[in-house]
């Protein structure tokens, strides 16, 4: 389902000229999105960022690799160690990777650049992909659907990566879906311990404005209240909202420990990101380079996941040092939350999703 080849001059000119699609970064309400960048390369290619013309893996390849996260983010550092460094070392520098971390703008800017071919590889979430390309696949990033990384990997193989799944829709837009890695668990911030659905009844909960997320939390019993992300701190401080949700990294980055006493590890949403490839770049690679890059990515997501999980534990400890009560996952009755939200999940699977919630849950 690869897309038709696009005019080759646009990609070549954009990459050689290093035209910036946009500059800036900002924490999005979902989990903190910013950009990657328009790297300047002079590959001499007329149809791809990769300067391959033979299948023997002997040609030089220049890859522009973007992420919305800044260089100090653990996911960026892990990608450098487990993917970029490995690729360059394995090929003795024949394949070089230009890392553009938080230099392109937000999620939409990065996806624009990937589609245009000014970026060859990008890390992005299933939520971002479903919002832009295929809302029927939002289940991969909706609350209380995915249990853990093993479950997500099974869902990825069954429903996302096949060409009759999400990947086919992405390929029609010039993007190929690759392997996924763990980014973090979205959990609950409040001024009381949250361990069961009873604890959230009537709480004014700030959520990103995703209809599917709102449906589930409404069903569970929270009073979902829209608040712009840049107003979250003050809204919690003044009581406009009682609670929020997000990863521990976000909780610390915006100092929510100053206005919330508890961080309850509800693990209601598994944050993941995928390796995404510009399809024209991918098709321009030799067979051996395709194998090298994709197999290295498959290995990298394992190491990246381990590094990020380890860092997450350190952040929980850091939050406790700031005076936060961290309610551990083992104290949370997650099954009760899933049961409470199940009617909404079933309605979503019937009216919006490409697959049934029971089929997704059966893969756990």
Segments from the language model and where they lie:
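Short helix-initiation/N-cap motifs at beta->coil->alpha
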Residues: 99-112, 209-212, 224-238, 330-335
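Pocket-lining segment of extracytoplasmic ligand-binding domains
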Residues: 212-214, 223-302
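Short, glycine-/small- and polar/acidic-enriched structural segments
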Residues: 56-62, 71-186, 242, 265-269
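Contiguous mixed-secondary-structure segments that line small-molecule binding/active-site clefts
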Residues: 84-85, 125-204, 210-223, 290, ...
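Conserved functional loop/turn residues at catalytic and ligand-binding sites
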Residues: 118, 204, 221, 239-240
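Structural motif corresponding to alpha-helix initiation and N-cap regions
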Residues: 107-108, 194, 229-230, 298, ...
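Terminal disorder- and signal-encoded targeting elements
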Residues: 1-69, 74-85, 89-94, 98, ...
């Amino acid at each position: 389902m690869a897309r038709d080849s696009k005019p080759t001059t646009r990609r070549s000119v954009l990459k050689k000229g290093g035209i910036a699609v946009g500059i800036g970064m900002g924490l999005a309400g979902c989990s903190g999105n910013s950009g990657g960048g328009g790297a300047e390369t002079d590959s001499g290619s007329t149809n791809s960022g990769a300067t391959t013309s033979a299948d023997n893996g002997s040609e030089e390849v220049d890859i522009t690799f973007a992420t919305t996260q800044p260089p100090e983010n653990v996911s960026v550092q892990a990608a450098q160690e487990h993917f970029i460094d490995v690729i360059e070392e394995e090929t003795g520098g024949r394949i070089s990777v230009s890392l553009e971390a938080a230099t392109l703008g937000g999620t939409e800017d990065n996806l624009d650049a990937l589609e245009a071919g000014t970026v060859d590889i990008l890390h992005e979430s299933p939520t971002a992909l479903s919002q832009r390309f295929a809302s029927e696949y939002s289940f991969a990033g909706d609350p209380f659907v995915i249990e853990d990384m093993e479950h997500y990997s099974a869902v990825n193989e069954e429903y996302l990566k096949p060409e009759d799944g999400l990947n086919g829709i992405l390929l029609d837009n010039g993007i190929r879906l690759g392997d996924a890695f763990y980014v973090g668990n979205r959990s609950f911030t409040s001024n009381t311990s949250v361990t069961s659905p009873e604890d959230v009844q009537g709480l004014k909960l700030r959520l990103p404005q995703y209809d599917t997320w709102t449906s589930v939390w409404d069903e569970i019993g929270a009073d979902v209240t829209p608040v712009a992300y840049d107003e979250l701190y003050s809204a919690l401080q003044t009581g406009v909202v009682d609670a929020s949700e997000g990863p521990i990294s976000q909780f610390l980055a915006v100092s929510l420990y100053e206005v919330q006493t508890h961080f309850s590890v509800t693990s209601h949403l598994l944050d993941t990101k995928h390796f995404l490839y510009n399809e024209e770049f991918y098709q321009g690679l030799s067979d051996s380079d395709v194998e090298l890059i994709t197999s290295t990515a498959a290995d990298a997501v394992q190491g990246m996941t381990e590094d990020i999980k380890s860092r997450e534990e350190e952040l929980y400890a850091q939050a406790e040092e700031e005076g936060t009560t961290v309610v551990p996952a083992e104290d949370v009755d997650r099954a009760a939350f899933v049961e409470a939200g199940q009617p909404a999940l079933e309605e979503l699977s019937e009216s919006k999703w490409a697959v049934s919630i029971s089929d997704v849950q059966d893969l756990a």
